[in-house]
Design a protein with these regions (language model features):
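Extended, folded cores of ATP/NTP-driven motor/assembly subunits in large transport
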Residues: 1-410, 421
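P-loop NTPase motor domains
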Residues: 35-53, 276-279, 292-299, 380-381, ...
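Short glycine-/polar-rich loops that comprise or flank the Walker A/P-loop
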Residues: 53-56, 109, 490-492, 517, ...
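P-loop NTPase motor core of the ASCE superfamily
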Residues: 100-101, 540-582, 729-817
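Charge-patterned, long linear interaction tracts outside catalytic cores
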Residues: 125, 439-445, 450-452, 457-470, ...
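Conserved P-loop NTPase motor cores
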Residues: 312-314, 450-484, 497-504, 520-525, ...
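Post-Walker A helix-loop "phosphate-sensing" segment adjacent to the P-loop in P-loop NTPases
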Residues: 485-495, 509
């Protein structure tokens, strides 16, 4: 029987004149939480349940659908800049590819909570008695009118207003602990359509008009409008329902809990959370909870205790041993009685029902077996009561009553709180750049890299910088390239420092944006001499002098603590800075002019570096002009013949060519500061591949912090691509990194370091195993909200796969799918 009598916003009246207020519980991220964090969530939920001393609670986990096309269309609104047309076409192609792979919609779990509103007793006086009699009489007339005419359902405006006030108080209580949203008529209708087999409609695309006719004393709605979402042919069999619509049919079966045969220990009892990851098909769950007050619960427990004592005495008098079941039950009852007496808590009558649907009977049987096995592993025995399918179906409807008393479980608030209601794995944004999908839930993951600086509610960082860490071949460069590419398509600008020259063919492999790709390949040819001279490359004279000091102290090893050499070097640099022709070669000339043993020694030391052809890029006589332009959307800077030191090489062991290579990286990275300080309205990226090479030297570390801080102020993100999280784990840098991506690692110390970098429990063996077992292209990701999950990076297009793949080519084509 359809229970709903009237709906007003989030209030639902049933045929017994009970009123429920329904809310959507905004899911909270539960993945990779520490045990302490899980207990905090558990306590909040337990308090939420325990605050109701009487009445009923109706909790629903519903597998709804969200439209992939709608999300992609929303993402298109974020696109700006010169490449807008290319980006729109790319997103459209991406949409078609995703729809062909996973369908128009993806499963999205939503959580609903309904609380029965308990009327406070009015003061007994003549006025209230008259009002009560009047309302009863009017209700009788309305019922007669509805029975005879079956058209309109009416509700007294006074009645509505009374419950609206009560609902406001309840909403205030709940919202202190969890994020909630009041339901609307559309939500109830969408829920009922789903329960009656109407699938394939995304919530965003669903409409449900519920016209109301407001009179002076009452409000009318059409009864047909209330029951419209339930329209379908329902055929009941012993173990399932067949739901038929004009264009589709589905089969639905219902399970209820027969017995819980073991302990559900928290944390590890979060059924609602784990079943989202376990099942590839939608599963709905209903918890109909009746609150039993503490006094009544104690009376029930003590009566049960008397029954058990009688059984024990009877066995004793008969000369038999008391069965182990009775002994265990007596222990449990004693413990429960003590607990209830001390805590003054309520008990809860729980009716737990699971709904499984499928397009045909064979698939329904397979899914039912899978659900039963999953609950069996948790020591929960399910049963599918024959002939009760329609009644159990009714338990899912808003404001419904418990259908059957045979399968009631008496539980405490701890048990209900430990089921993980509302827990899910959430990553990224609702719209933006599609980078892949969650390995655990299969949900698409979207990012908006420029969002951090906007101060969006809920974010735990305002840092635009990102880190990509992991061992060789895990996929960090691929992920980094993909994110930079789409950021440029969406209207951003990027400078990529490409020390290994892996991106030199992008103009050929990415023809759609070739005109906006600028590849600067710095060779040791004569025409390039001096292009990386600090005095030449920096626009500002002071910046050039500062960088010259950094480079020359780095190359010569002269420390600020060296009271003899340092002042001489700085004096020479300052004189060159003030001259007309500024260049590092002129610093040597200036030192020789001093003609002291110390100045000649420093001049000879610097001059020794110029003997390398490769070093000509760094040294100029002040006549070279800066020809490096970063005006394109995507700029790639390569330096031929760079020789980076090995990751484990200490600074003291660097060869001369390695010193020069790192010095050039520092110069180019500093040059990126000018790029960062360009148009603040455009999101910019400075991408530092092999970042460890200069993060491991003092000058590079200082520069990194400078880049990150400038980037945050000027709407620019610095992307560090490096092999070890230790390179970016120093507090000064770590706290300024927003998005984090960690790819596979097998070294235990590195794994622990990475988990610490993510703010996770580094000693947790499960966390370590997740990172160790990541496959190629999978990464641990932390978003701007501090949420962590495992993502499969998904380029969608094979041309992007080939363009961004930095692995050596193989002779035969491999099927990457």
């Amino acid at each position: 029987m359809f229970p709903i009598k009237y709906i007003d916003n989030n209030l639902v009246w049933n045929k017994d004149n009970e009123v429920f207020a329904y809310y959507e519980l905004i899911p909270y991220n539960y993945s990779f939480l520490s045990p302490e964090q899980k207990y905090l969530v558990h306590d909040s939920f337990r308090q939420l349940i325990a605050q109701s001393r009487e009445g009923k609670i109706h909790a629903l986990q519903i597998a709804t659908e969200s439209s992939i096309r709608s999300i992609q269309e929303q993402s298109k609104k974020l696109v700006t800049g010169k490449l807008r047309e290319v980006a729109i076409q790319k997103i459209d192609d991406q949409t078609e590819a995703l729809v062909s792979m996973i369908g128009d919609n993806q499963v999205d779990y939503r959580f609903f909570l309904g609380f029965k509103l308990m009327v406070t007793e009015d003061e007994v006086n003549l006025k209230n008695i008259k009002k009560s009699v009047f309302l009863t009489f009017r209700e009788f007339l309305n019922e007669v009118r509805h029975t005879l005419m079956n058209d309109f359902v009416s509700m007294s405006n006074d009645e509505i207003n009374r419950y609206v006030k009560m609902e406001k108080l309840l909403e205030n209580k709940i919202s202190r602990r969890f994020k909630i949203r009041r339901l609307e008529a559309k939500d109830f209708a969408y829920l009922m359509e789903h329960l009656y087999g109407r699938d394939g409609i995304a919530y965003e695309d669903y409409e449900y008009p519920l016209p109301k006719r407001k009179l002076k004393r009452e409000t009318l709605i059409k009864y047909y409008d209330l029951i419209r979402p339930t329209r379908c042919v329902v055929e009941e069999s012993q173990r399932y329902l067949r739901l038929e619509h004009e264009d589709s049919e589905s089969y639905v079966s219902y399970f209820t809990v027969n017995a819980i045969v073991g302990e559900l220990d928290f944390p590890s009892s979060e059924i609602f959370y784990f079943q989202q990851q376990q099942f590839t098909f939608p599963v709905d769950t209903s918890m109909n909870v009746e609150i039993v007050g503490n006094k009544k619960a104690l009376t029930t427990v003590r009566n049960k205790k008397k029954e058990l004592n009688d059984l024990d005495n009877h066995a004793y008098q008969a000369g038999n041993e008391t069965s182990s079941n009775v002994v265990e039950a007596l222990d449990s009852v004693d413990e429960l009685e003590t607990d209830l007496d001390q805590s003054k808590e309520s008990m809860y009558k729980l009716s737990y029902v699971i709904r499984v649907s499928a397009p045909d009977l064979d698939e329904l049987k397979r899914r039912c077996d899978e659900v039963k096995d999953f609950y069996d592993d948790l020591n929960v025995k399910l049963v599918r009561p024959a002939g009760d399918m329609m009644g159990l179906h009714g338990e899912f409807l808003p404001a419904s009553k418990r259908y059957i008393n045979d399968y009631i479980q008496y539980v405490k608030s701890d048990f209900l709180a430990g089921l993980g209601f509302g827990a899910t794995q959430m990553l990224g944004e609702n719209t933006g750049i599609y980078i892949g999908y969650s390995v655990d839930t299969g949900r698409n993951v979207y990012l908006q890299p420029s969002l951090a600086s906007q101060g969006v509610k809920g974010t735990v960082t305002n840092a635009l910088a990102s880190a990509f860490v992991g061992s060789l071949g895990g996929g960090k460069s691929f992920c980094n390239n993909l994110l930079v590419y789409y950021s440029v398509l969406f209207g951003g600008q990027a400078v990529i420092l490409d020390p290994k020259s892996e991106r030199g063919n992008w103009k050929e492999t990415l023809p759609e944006i070739a005109e906006e790709i600028n590849i600067v390949n710095l060779t040791s040819d004569k025409e390039n001499a001096g292009l990386l001279d600090p005095f030449v490359i920096m626009k500002d004279k002071e910046d050039g002098a500062t960088l010259a000091k950094e480079i020359l102290t780095f190359l010569t090893g002269i420390s600020t603590r060296d009271g003899d050499k340092f002042p001489v070097l700085i004096s020479a640099i300052s004189k060159v800075s003030e001259s007309e022709h500024r260049g590092l070669l002129n610093v040597i000339t200036e030192l020789r002019k001093e003609n002291t043993p110390i100045s000649n020694h420093i001049a000879n030391h610097i001059d020794s570096f110029t003997n390398y052809d490769f070093a000509h890029l760094l040294f100029s006589d002040g006549t070279a002009k800066n020809t490096i332009s970063l005006d394109n959307q995507l700029n790639i800077i390569q330096v031929a013949d760079l020789v980076l030191p090995d990751k484990d090489t200490t600074f003291d062991e660097y060869t001369t060519i390695e010193l020069l290579s790192v010095a050039m990286l520092i110069v180019i990275s500093t040059f990126a500061l000018d790029f960062i300080h360009s148009d603040r309205s455009i999101f910019k990226i400075v991408d530092l591949d092999e970042a460890w090479a200069f993060l491991n030297v003092a000058q590079g570390e200082t520069l990194s912090n400078k880049l990150v801080r400038a980037g945050r102020a000027m709407n620019a993100g610095v992307y560090f691509v490096t092999q070890s999280s230790g390179d970016v784990s120093k507090e000064s840098l770590k706290n300024n990194i927003g998005l984090k991506f960690a790819f596979r690692s097998t070294d235990t110390n590195e794994i622990k370091q990475t988990l610490e970098f993510f703010g996770l429990d580094s000693e947790d063996e499960n966390n370590q195993k997740r990172l160790r077992d990541l496959e190629n292209g999978q990464c641990l990701m932390q978003d701007l909200y501090g949420r962590v999950g495992v993502v499969q990076i998904h380029p969608v297009f094979v041309e992007l796969l080939h363009a961004f793949d930095t692995r050596p080519p193989i002779k035969s084509e491999v099927d990457l799918e």
